[in-house]
Amino acid sequence: MAGRHSQEKSYAEAAAAPAPEKPDSSDVTPAVPADVIYKLLGFTAAMIVGPIGMYFVTVDFGASSTVAGVTAAVTANVILFTYIYVAWLEDKEDREVAAKRKEKKAQ
């Protein structure tokens, strides 16, 4: 009858065994490129400062708080749609580069 832990290596066997080979090259690139992070941080700052700033600028020029609120909401939407457009353009460029690479591999 076999022992309970017959499949497992003892500590001495594991220590005597050669270390697993390391890969020749490893991918150390970040999961998200730095320029994407910088764009996100820039648009985040714009989303915080823009609408609040527009609200107070509009109120300072004598408009009612309702008009200032609408102005702030419009500003937030403009910033949001601009971010979406920039992200779409970036994705479009990435797809074009991938298509060119695929085209070169096919030749």
Swiss-Prot record:
The chain crosses the membrane at residues 41-61, 69-89. One of its GO terms (cellular component) is ER to Golgi transport vesicle membrane. Keywords: Cytoplasmic vesicle, Endoplasmic reticulum, Membrane, Transmembrane, Transmembrane helix. It is a multi-pass membrane protein. Residues 62-68 are lumenal. Residues 1-29 are annotated as: Disordered. InterPro entries: Vma21. Residues 1-40, 90-107 are cytoplasmic. A motif (Prevents secretion from ER) lies at residues 104-107. Residues 1-11 have a biased composition (Basic and acidic residues). GO terms for biological process: vacuolar proton-transporting V-type ATPase complex assembly. It comes from the Eukaryota. The keyword Transmembrane helix applies. It is found in: Endoplasmic reticulum membrane; Endoplasmic reticulum-Golgi intermediate compartment membrane; Cytoplasmic vesicle, COPII-coated vesicle membrane. Required for the assembly of the V0 complex of the vacuolar ATPase (V-ATPase) in the endoplasmic reticulum. Belongs to the VMA21 family. PANTHER family: VACUOLAR ATPASE ASSEMBLY INTEGRAL MEMBRANE PROTEIN VMA21 (PTHR31792:SF3). This is Vacuolar ATPase assembly integral membrane protein vma21. It comes from Aspergillus clavatus (strain ATCC 1007 / CBS 513.65 / DSM 816 / NCTC 3887 / NRRL 1 / QM 1276 / 107).
